[in-house]
Every structure is written in C-alpha cells, then in structure tokens.
Regions:
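Intrinsic disorder at enzyme termini
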Residues: 2-7
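N- or domain-start disorder-to-order transition segments that initiate the globular core
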Residues: 8, 12-15, 19-33
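Short, structured patches in soluble enzyme cores that scaffold and shape functional sites
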Residues: 124-126, 142, 154, 169-172, ...
Length: 332
C-alpha cells in the first residue's frame, strides 16, 4: 500500500483550479471543453496524479486499486468530467502494474510509456455492444509481421483531448475446422492509426470472459474507478440538493415523510454504493495462483458492483429532484 495516497496529491487549492465541472456550467460560461480538460490533465500530471498506479521503480506511488478509487472519488466531487477522462489512463496503468508484479512483462511497455508522460485512453466500446471485453463488435485482420488492422473503429470513451495511445479491442475469426469462437485481440494504437504492431498487442485469447491477471485486473480497475466517479457525481448532486432546501422547525403534530423519505433513501443508497465499491477494491492486486477463479465469481462480483452503483446513482439523482422540489424540510 502506497505511503502517499492518490488523494493526498489533490489539494483543495488544486481542485479549485480545475475546470472539469459540469457540461451545463461550462456551456453557460462559454468554455472550450477540450482545452479546459487538456489544462486539467496537465495540472494533474504536474502533481504526479496520473502516475499513482505505477510501481515506485517506474516513478509512481504503487497505489492499490482501493487507493486509486478513493482518489477518483475526491477528484470527481470537484471536477467530474476531468475524473472521467483520466479514468482509462488509471485503469490501464493499474492493470499493467498488477501484471508486472506477478512477473508478467508483456505489458511492461505501458508502464515505461506512462513513466515518460504518455497518456492512455479507452476505446474498446463499440456501437451496439455492451459487453466490451467479452463480446466486442469490432473486427480486425492480420497486417504486417504479427500485427493487426482494425476495420471499424471503436468508440473513444475517454482522454479525448490528450491521449497518446488508445486501447482497441476486436475479434478475429481464424478459419479452421476446430475454431468454435474467434480470438479477441486487445491492443493499443497511436493517433491516426488503425494498425497495431506486434509489440503493442496486449492479449490475443479466445473471445469470452477474461481469465488472466491483466485483463481481469483491467476490468476490476476500470469498473471500480468509473463506479467511483458515478458515486461522487451522485453524492455531489445529493449534497447540493440538501444544502439548497430551507429547514423549518418541526410541527408538533407529526412528521413530514413525503419530504424526509427521499433524503433518507438517497443517503442509504449512497452508503450502500460506497460499501460495494470498497468490497470489490479491497482484495486487489490479486496473484493468479492465490485466486484461480479470476474469470468466474470474481468477475460476477465486479459486474454486480458496477450495476448496483449505476442503478443506485440513477435513483439518487431521481431522489434529488424530489428533494429539490420540496419547499422545506422539517428539522429534527
């Protein structure tokens, strides 16, 4: 566990200078979103926040997934858009660090690139595909010496203003009598390229549930970090709604449940979301020999956490509308 936590790098003064607040606020101010986010990313890089997951020998803090998720929650409370766009960089470097600690040097280059300042984006989402790693809709074909060309680009989901490498994920059908399912190819492409050379291919394995340390860690880091951003966004909306209401003395003849219940339910859901994230992030990093079921129950727990946080955040945002519409809340 890192002695200096990621959240320790995010001083109050730094958070106040970040511009990645809400889209509505930026639109009202006439701001240039890509330029603002690029400046935010540069500020986070200056304090070392983008390298928190790198092992110390690569110039990072060597933080755990739980520490990284905690840092993202703090960042998202002040600048949710900025937290969202740096999420992919954190989960790719975090997964690469997990693999490196197990003796797997196949993605060590990610750590080296990040140490020199390169930024990684997530682009494995595909239009109409919601399983991403397990069932990509993009297709690829061999190109050059052991490389691949990606025929239809994926959706660039993060780091849009500033990335150097983007993760691309696609399937490749191998024409053979015994091929029951295609290979899934996870690789990284540079700007303006649809091809990846062999040394930038992270994994080629049968399509389906990932079962190795790197891909499973990438899923764990990705879902936990993005869920942390969702949680903080919901918490921020809840806090703002409660702060805006007008507390009044309670009437002698009973309570006001229609006003008070949404506050109570939202608070309970937020507590449950935070606890679920903590439950999933606590055991990472994992060593495959200690947890042979990387692609089974462990994945189910990760997806359950993400679903519960997404549903909980949506419900909290609905409840904040009810809270904000209440004329007053009886003080107890």
């Amino acid at each position: 566990m890192a002695a200096i936590r990621p959240r320790d790098l995010l001083s109050d003064g730094l958070l106040e200078r970040l511009g990645g607040t809400s889209l509505a606020a930026r639109a009202a101010a006439g701001g240039d979103t890509p330029a603002i986010l690029s400046r935010d990313i540069a500020k986070l890089g200056e304090v070392g926040y983008l390298n928190v997951a790198l092992p110390p020998e690569f110039g990072g803090l060597g933080c755990t997934l739980r520490q990284a998720a905690c840092g993202q929650r703090r960042l998202a409370r002040s600048a949710p858009l900025t937290a969202s766009v740096v999420s992919a960089h954190l989960y790719w470097t975090g997964a690469a660090a997990d693999a490196y600690r197990t003796g797997d040097n196949s993605v060590r280059w990610i750590l080296l690139e990040a140490a020199r300042g390169a930024l990684f984006a997530g682009g494995h989402a595909t239009a109409g595909g919601d399983l991403h790693f397990a069932d990509p809709h993009s297709r690829c074909e061999p190109a050059g010496e052991s490389g691949y060309r990606f025929r239809d680009p994926a959706v660039l989901a993060s780091m849009t203003p500033a990335w150097d490498w983007v993760a691309v994920h696609a399937v490749h059908w191998v024409p053979s009598p015994g091929a029951a399912r295609p290979d899934a190819v996870l690789a990284f492409a540079g700007r303006g390229s649809r091809c990846t050379p062999a040394f930038r291919i992270a994994r080629v394995q049968p399509a389906g549930s990932p079962a190795d340390a790197f891909t499973t860690s990438a899923i764990a880091w990705g879902h936990a970090i993005l869920a942390s951003v969702q949680y903080s966004d919901a918490r921020r909306a809840f806090n703002a709604a409660v702060a805006a209401i007008d507390p009044v003395p309670a009437a002698p003849a009973g309570g006001h449940p229609l006003d008070q219940w949404p506050v109570a339910e939202a608070g309970l859901r937020l507590d449950a979301m935070k606890a679920k994230i903590a439950e999933i992030t606590h055991p990472w990093p994992l060593v495959p020999e200690q947890d042979p079921d990387l692609g089974g129950q462990r994945l189910i727990g990760i997806f359950t956490m993400r679903h519960e946080v997404a549903e909980g955040a949506a419900r909290v945002l609905d409840l904040t509308s009810q809270i904000a519409s209440a004329p007053a809340i009886a003080a107890r």
